[in-house]
């Protein structure tokens, strides 16, 4: 669902997309995976809204520190938010959400933005990594990111 929405957006089809941090790509990528998981898991509308809200807040917070333009692909920033939102829907804690975001950062570091084009849409199957990161975190699998 997320990849189809991104493909349609980047192909220029006339469908609306929620924008966040000045980008429709970020809006789609931080909301659709959480909504999809929430519906799949049978969560209530309120639970899904809370998951999307957390995802959006984390995406905004993360993107704030990169400036308006960044060489990192949208899925890098919005995927971290989506992972945390999915963890919330799974009943996870802040510790597990943090671990899921670390997994996403490690998984997608180096994915470079090449502009909003069809080539950009090829990167967005990586939103599945948000789900996998949430699953790893919920199983207690985490690692520390060590700064140099």
Show the residue positions of the predicted features:
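Short alpha-helical scaffolding segments that buttress acidic/His motifs in well-ordered protein cores
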Residues: 1-6, 51-55, 59, 101-104
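Accessory "access/gating" subregions that flank catalytic or transport cores
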Residues: 1-25
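C-terminal structural cap/anchor segments
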Residues: 67-69, 77-96
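Functionally critical mobile loop/hinge segments
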Residues: 1, 88-148
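Active-site nucleophile and cofactor-binding loops and adjacent substrate-binding regions
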Residues: 18-25, 67-78
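A glycine-rich phosphate/pyrophosphate-binding beta-strand-loop-alpha-helix module
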Residues: 26, 31, 42-61
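Alpha-helical support elements that line or immediately flank enzyme active sites
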Residues: 27-43, 83-91
């Amino acid at each position: 669902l997320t990849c189809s929405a991104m493909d349609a957006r980047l192909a220029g089809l006339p469908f609306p997309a929620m924008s966040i941090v000045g980008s429709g790509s970020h809006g789609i990528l931080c909301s659709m995976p959480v909504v999809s998981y929430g519906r799949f898991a049978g969560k209530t509308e309120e639970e899904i809204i809370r998951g999307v809200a957390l995802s959006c807040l984390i995406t905004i917070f993360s993107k704030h520190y990169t400036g308006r333009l960044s060489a990192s692909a949208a899925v890098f920033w919005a995927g971290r938010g989506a992972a945390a939102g999915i963890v919330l829907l799974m009943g996870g804690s802040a510790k597990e959400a943090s671990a899921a975001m670390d997994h996403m950062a490690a998984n997608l570091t180096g994915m470079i933005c090449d502009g909003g084009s069809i080539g950009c849409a090829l990167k967005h199957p990586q939103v599945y990594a948000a789900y996998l990161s949430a699953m790893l975190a919920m199983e207690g699998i985490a690692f520390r990111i060590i700064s140099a």
